Amino acid sequence: MTQSVVQALSAFSQRFLQHCAQQTGQLPENDELLGLASPCVVEELTDVVRWRPVNREVWADFSNVERAIELTLHEDIKAFYASQFSADMPAQWRGRELTLLQVWSEDDFTRLQENILGHLVMQRRLKQKPTVFIATTEDEMAVVSVCNLSGNVILEKLGTAQREVLTADLETFLEQLEPKVN
């Protein structure tokens, strides 16, 4: 499944680039990432950075997170975050607006690992099944996550047991995503 997740993420990234080109005539732009180093940066303007996703030559390693929480992360989660650098990408899944989270740089990967660890520690304290977030939603208390046990993609309400299965796996979810330009 890991390689198929990488292919589905890459395919979505290409759809996102094409959608941006069709809507704006150029590469995606982001004002929040201006001045932050990344292999994704194509051009820095006065108020925005233009960027494109870049495949990692060497996949990122999650072993320190796994050791710290004494839990092996689902291979799809590792493939999703370890295979490319990219800015977050706005999208829709069956009419639901979301932002697909990505890793901008090595520094950003360190921050992501800290956030994943904090999320898993919170879930452990609440005696919930472990998940790892992959997207934010308009509701700041709801995130799209991958269940670490089943690989299901779910919509979960943070700090509660409220979960809704969206797809059986991450590959299917990524294939069904539609890019959106904000």
From Swiss-Prot:
Q: Which Gene3D superfamilies match?
A: Syd protein
Q: Name one Pfam family in it.
A: Syd
CDD domains, per database record: Syd
Q: Does the keyword Cell membrane apply?
A: yes
One of the record's GO cellular component terms: cytoplasmic side of plasma membrane
Give the membrane topology.
Answer: Peripheral membrane protein
Q: Which UniProt keywords apply?
A: Cell inner membrane, Cell membrane, Membrane
What the entry lists under InterPro entries is as follows: Syd (IPR009948), Syd_sf (IPR038228)
Instruction: From the Swiss-Prot or TrEMBL record, state where the protein is found.
Output: Cell inner membrane
Where primarily located? membrane
The text of the family note is: Belongs to the Syd family.
Known role? Interacts with the SecY protein in vivo. May bind preferentially to an uncomplexed state of SecY, thus functioning either as a chelating agent for excess SecY in the cell or as a regulatory factor that negatively controls the translocase function.
Q: What is this protein called?
A: Protein Syd
